[in-house]
Amino acid sequence: MNHEPKKECFKTSVGGQALMEGIMMRGPEHICCAVRKPDGTIETKIEDTPKHGIWAKIPLVRGAISMIESLITGYRYMMYSAQVSMGDEYDAEEEESAFEKWVGDHLGKKAEDIMLAAAAVIGGLFAILLFTVLPTVLVGGLNHLVPLNRWAKVVLEAVLKVAIFLTYMAAISRMKEIHRVFEYHGAEHKTIACYEAGDPLTVENVRKYTRFHPRCGTSFLILVVIVSVFLYSVLPWSSTSLRVVFKLLLLPLVMGISYELLKWCGRSDNIATRIIRQPGLWVQRLTVFEPDDSMIEVAIAAVTPVLPEDPEDGKW
């Protein structure tokens, strides 16, 4: 009986982000944002991919840089997609706050960069407060009521962190607008999987692939949660406020380790990497849903312009 050798699936660095009625895809040289307009047509916007020089090549350091850059870029394209998808209903002057108008009047072209950076900082601070500070404060408060030993506090803090993260993801996925974004998330994953398998990018081909992908932002976030649990377990509990300070100082290292694990799991397929990436695949059931064909069309429109002529140039 003949057995054909199993074809190794190509792993690409091309990836993206789901938006409001659209998708942003990022390749080695270009970024393309494709958004479904109210009239049913697809609008695309293509820009050069930002370069970060040597810093983007240093292990552990590149993880924090990638996270910050993704927050800023992602927010910018999310705002753009909201504007395009709303069409004539979007009123830039109405949406602009007094503060934004003041910044625009006084800083001109720098205003957008400042507002995007500020939005990214606010979003980052919210995530830090919710997933890093809150569990520690809750355990510290409980410890004043019911004295706990060190490992009881470590375990309880870990359980609270995971519970808060999963509850937050489950809650926002029930919002109608966010649920559609998560459906576009599925279209993004399916399209990348189709490309990596070497199939032509058609709706029929893309539709048959899984919506789950190991190299996903959700997988990175769950890795951050898991790595932080282990790394923070060695920190002292003598003072709740001091523990919070130590956790904040170690956060760039947590992101760096998580990013390197994601890179490793993306390149290798063995028992260890399958175990490490499995929690991320489980959590994707909360953040990635099956798309319809119109969403797949948008994903194809977004990824096609950013694919390198030589696939090796975009190898993971």
Model features per residue range: what roles?
Residues 1-94:
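Divalent-cation
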Residues 49-50, 54, 67, 71-96, ...:
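Multi-pass alpha-helical transmembrane bundle typical of ion/small-solute transporters
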Residues 74, 81, 131, 135, ...:
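Alpha-helical transmembrane segments of polytopic integral membrane proteins
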Residues 101-110, 137-156, 235-245, 264-274, ...:
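Membrane interface segments of multi-pass transport proteins and intramembrane proteases
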Residues 111-129, 209-234:
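Transmembrane alpha-helical segments and their cytosolic interface motifs
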